[in-house]
């Protein structure tokens, strides 16, 4: 996981299909991976803003960890698509410079989604993200992908 740790930024076309999203236009993405509890787990956060409106498009957190009982890698999280709350969980695989999540999600309104996210480290400062096999309440949605650059700017707290 170490090569993924840090902040990643991009501008991209908006993805659609999830309840609460405005489905067209450009979005600004900030994704961050950081270690938790002596490198026993990783927190992944997303903050995505719709460029035209300045409104929240997606925000959320996921915890990436190993299940002590099974030894398998797992993902669980929560957040908002627009103003619609969701929670999700899934499995995780790490293959060389690629992380693959297979996610199940449900919104506060009981909308159910399934999707796969592939995060590939193409270079030390270049991360590609693909969202595929997206189904919302059983209806297939368009795949989506973008490339993010490592944010090397530092800010003081």
Where are these regions (language model features)?
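Hydrophobic small-molecule pocket/channel-lining residues, especially in calycin-type beta-barrels
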Residues: 1-157
């Amino acid at each position: 996981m170490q090569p993924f740790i840090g902040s990643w930024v991009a501008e991209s076309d908006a993805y659609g299909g999830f309840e609460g999203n405005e489905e067209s236009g450009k979005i600004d993405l900030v994704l961050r991976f950081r270690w938790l509890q002596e490198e026993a787990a990783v927190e992944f956060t997303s903050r995505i803003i719709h460029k035209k409106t300045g409104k929240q498009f997606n925000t959320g957190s996921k915890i990436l960890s190993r299940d002590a009982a099974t030894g398998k890698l797992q993902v669980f999280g929560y957040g908002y698509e627009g103003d619609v709350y969701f929670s999700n969980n899934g499995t995780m695989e790490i293959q060389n410079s690629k992380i693959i999540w297979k996610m199940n999600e449900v919104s506060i309104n009981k909308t159910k989604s399934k999707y796969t996210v592939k995060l590939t480290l193409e270079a030390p400062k270049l991360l590609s993200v693909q969202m595929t096999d997206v189904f919302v309440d059983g209806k297939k949605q368009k795949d989506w992908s973008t490339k993010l650059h490592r944010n090397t700017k530092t800010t003081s707290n």
